[in-house]
Amino acid sequence: MLDPSARLPFVTPLVLSNLAKEHGAETPDLSFEVNAPTSLKKAASSNGADTIQGAVDVLRALASMYANVGLMGANEAESNAVDAYLVQSDALATAPFQAAMQCADDLDQHLALRTYLVGFRVTAADAAIWGAIRSSSPLLGIIKKHAHAHLARWYAHVDALLAFSSAVTMMAEAKSNMFKNKK
């Protein structure tokens, strides 16, 4: 369940679902509801008992669900790094300017010689940090000023990937439908 009117990295679960779909994995049904908390119902559950709630917990569950396609990295060390970025993304989305600037500095330095945040292919870490940046006005401003060349390069690269761009399109359509239904 995703809220298309939410400000936080609401689009990231769609990206993870799209990445899994690109690798032939079966993905959960996604639904959109205004003012609904981000949640994921486990496949075997028809009642709410096995519902995961909260942005980070949903991202962790989706990344773990699709670990076989590499969303959690290639090994335990990468998996731990991905998890750290998932946690960081939650705080990053609402960080004030000074904290956002420090994080942008750290990410820029980390990405100096890398294409992806963890390992050699896109992971849940890339999706989570991209979603946090996308929902953060200070971070978008920092990237648009090109003061952090490596971070800007990485952001442009992942933003252009089909799984990411189609997630943005899906969420825009859900928002549009939400406003159409209000009339």
Where are these predicted regions, by residue range?
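GST-like domain detector, emphasizing the conserved glutathione-binding G-site
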Residues: 1-117, 121, 134-137
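Extended, well-ordered alpha-helical scaffold segments
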Residues: 77-81, 100-103, 145-160
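Short acidic/histidine-centered micro-motifs embedded in hydrophobic/aromatic stretches
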Residues: 85-88, 130, 170-174
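A short hydrophobic/aromatic micro-motif that marks alpha-helical segments and, especially, helix-coil
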Residues: 93, 140-141, 176-177
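Polar helix-capping/helix-linker motif
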Residues: 113, 161-164
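GST superfamily/GST-like fold recognition
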Residues: 117-140, 147-156
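C-terminal helix/juxtamembrane-tail motif
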Residues: 163-183
